[in-house]
């Protein structure tokens, strides 16, 4: 798919299709009014007949509109003009792309980016249109023998901006949107892979492929032997029941000669059976998504490589598989972590934190500016926040605020939960320094409280994506989140000016 921006009048576009908005009740947008005027009232007469009300998602495809050079005009219902918000805008774009793909129009000029969206500017509208378009066209069908493809798919999309002085910001929005979309696609592809393909070695191979493609990226992979030498006994315990070797890939992006790195750590449980504390059979297939954190870090590193930002970033993919077996770790085991702290295992299905605690200890050697871990960590986060919002906890208020700001800018929402000292009491163990679970109350918070014991030397934030990393049901599959949030955070950290409020 090719994207571009231009500034021009709708009636002068020589295109397979021009896309304009119609508001409820049967009110033409300013651009649609221009087409109506040049067509001598042709469009408004259709609306008066009741062909289109303008409700959100309604579509009306017109052919050979009088006075218009374009072959087709697609009227898109946008709802009530004053109520057009971010969510509705993205839904409208998504429905528009689906419709265009079915019309046989291989290219189109879209004027929906001129609509007024509350609190959002041209940059945001163009970038979100790019990201939404790419997400809407995504499919994971490489294991299907019969692939359904449109007869004449949409190949080129031009977004119109109101003035020529906005062309530069529109081009920047496309570049940023394509980078985020690339990262999201990588994340979705890797996460959707079946666990008999995507094991820790596969994750590591994807990290190496990225390094092979860019001169300023290097990748190192640590296997179980080196982990043992480093004392990563907590990480290794989780891997003991599986025949697939645990591997931790460290991807280093160098965009600045001497800046301290931002470190992203992704939980990479390529399959989580629960171990000895085994999960129910129903829905266990979705535990291939327990590496969603690592997939999102890999995707973010791809987006970063596309953007070539002037910062240093290290992405860690903590790959592992949690399986039952004769050598698997057990409830009651006491583990000595890389930090030297001891952990009593009360539940082997609380394994993500046991992998992450050693990974978080390991990254201290990089003298990081900031560390952010990303993990499908707790079912409790789904109970608290559902499937729309990522859980955020942090030991540093400015970092938490940065991430919340990035989440709002990117449309990839997060919500901060508290991390008060009182929650630490739930992790007390009579036999070790701590237990690996803290009981049913505040499960997301106690999981983060556990991790916070290994992050005292640097500014740290934790993103719990258990509810947002994938969808179940008829839309089953990875969402690619929180790649947009993380990429926006890196854009902001690099000093790129990308959005101005209207």
Curated annotation (Swiss-Prot):
Cofactor note: Binds 2 manganese ions per subunit.
Subcellular location: Cytoplasm
GO cellular component, one term: cytoplasm
Positions that bind Mn(2+) 1: 272, 349, 351
GO MF: manganese ion binding; metalloaminopeptidase activity
Enzyme nomenclature, EC number: 3.4.11.1, 3.4.11.10
Active-site residues (renumbered): 279, 353
Top class in the EC scheme: hydrolase
Alphabetized Pfam families for the sequence: Peptidase_M17, Peptidase_M17_N
Protein name as catalogued: Probable cytosol aminopeptidase
Taxonomic path: Bacteria, Pseudomonadati, Pseudomonadota, Gammaproteobacteria, Aeromonadales
